[in-house]
């Protein structure tokens, strides 16, 4: 029965798939079998059994054994992960950073140039900024009424008034000088010449008066009948300058004749005085 028992054990040990080596018999059982005669008979009857120290079957792996990865060990800390990222992508980081810095520099330069162009357009180059901006005026805006300086008095206006008054005075003086002179009657048979500035009508009146005076005696003609007072005659003679020396002599002779007539008395023939019509 012992060989049948051994065969049953071998059959039970063969279909186990997950064991790499055959199941070895326990050492106590082998010793018991070796000490008895049955073990010798069994060994003689079954020479195909392997020795007890060697495995019964050769290893036959049915599934692949898991092998360790050759790559780096995954980081266990955040800082180590960042360092590993920089080490792997150092070239990419350098290129992207340089491009970003270059773009920022170009944008800043363009903005600065634009501001300078605006400043030069508002403040022309020929005039500095100080002429346009008052740095002392911190508040800005127009000045208050108290800060506005008072205007200096305009002397030209006063001069204009003075010249107008002077012009009016000159005009009045000229009109006084241009008044018509006293109409002098002829003395001693000589008629007085009219003064310059008289009109043609005045000359005609003077000529008609001379003709009437020649018809009547000179002694009967007085200043009162003529209606010309002595004061007005003297005033007009002073206001109007004599045109020539001949006219001055004629007026002097006429005044002397009037004085002599006043001293002698009234005229002898009153009829002659009635004929003379007084002329103003």
Swiss-Prot record:
Pfam family name, one? TMEM119
Which organism does this sequence originate in? Mus musculus
**Which stretches of this protein does UniProt put in the Cytoplasmic compartment?**
113-280
Which PANTHER family does the protein's record reference? TRANSMEMBRANE PROTEIN 119
Q: Which residues lie on this side of the membrane: Extracellular?
A: 21-91
The encoding gene is Tmem119
> What job does this protein perform?
Plays an important role in bone formation and normal bone mineralization. Promotes the differentiation of myoblasts into osteoblasts. May induce the commitment and differentiation of myoblasts into osteoblasts through an enhancement of BMP2 production and interaction with the BMP-RUNX2 pathway. Up-regulates the expression of ATF4 which plays a central role in osteoblast differentiation. Essential for normal spermatogenesis and late testicular differentiation.
Residue spans of biased composition, Basic and acidic residues class? 148-162
Q: What is this protein called?
A: Transmembrane protein 119
Could you say what a knockout of this gene produces? Mice show a significant decrease in bone formation and bone mineralization and the mineralization defect is independent of calcium and phosphate metabolisms. Testis is smaller, sperm number is significantly decreased and testicular differentiation is perturbed. Significantly reduced cortical thickness in the mid-shaft of the femur at postnatal day 14 (P14), and progressive bone hypoplasia after 8 weeks.
Membrane topology, as annotated: Single-pass type I membrane protein
């Amino acid at each position: 029965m012992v060989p049948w028992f051994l065969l049953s054990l071998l059959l039970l040990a063969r279909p186990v798939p997950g064991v790499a080596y055959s199941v070895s018999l326990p050492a106590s059982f082998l010793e018991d079998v070796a000490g008895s005669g049955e073990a010798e008979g069994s060994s003689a009857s079954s020479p195909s059994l392997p020795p007890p120290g060697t495995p019964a079957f050769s290893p036959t792996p049915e599934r692949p054994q898991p092998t360790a990865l050759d790559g780096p060990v995954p980081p266990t800390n955040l800082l180590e992960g960042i360092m590993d990222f920089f080490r792997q992508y150092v070239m990419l980081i350098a290129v992207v950073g340089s491009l970003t810095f270059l773009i920022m520099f170009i944008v800043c330069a363009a903005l600065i140039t634009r501001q300078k162009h605006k400043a030069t357009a508002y403040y022309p180059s020929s005039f500095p900024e100080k002429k346009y901006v008052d740095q002392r005026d911190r508040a800005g805006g127009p000045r208050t009424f108290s800060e506005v300086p008072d205007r200096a008095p305009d002397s030209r206006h006063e001069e204009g008034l003075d010249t107008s008054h002077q012009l009016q005075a000159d005009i009045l003086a000229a009109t006084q000088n241009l008044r018509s002179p006293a109409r002098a009657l002829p003395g001693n048979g000589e008629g007085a010449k009219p003064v310059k500035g008289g009109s043609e009508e005045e000359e005609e009146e003077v000529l008609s008066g001379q003709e009437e005076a020649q018809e009547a005696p000179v002694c009967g003609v007085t200043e009162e009948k003529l209606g010309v007072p002595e004061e007005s005659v003297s005033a007009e003679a002073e206001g109007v300058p004599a045109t020539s020396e001949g006219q001055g002599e004629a007026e002097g002779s006429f005044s002397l004749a009037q004085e002599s007539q006043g001293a002698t008395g009234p005229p002898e023939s009153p009829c002659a005085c009635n004929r003379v019509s007084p002329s103003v």
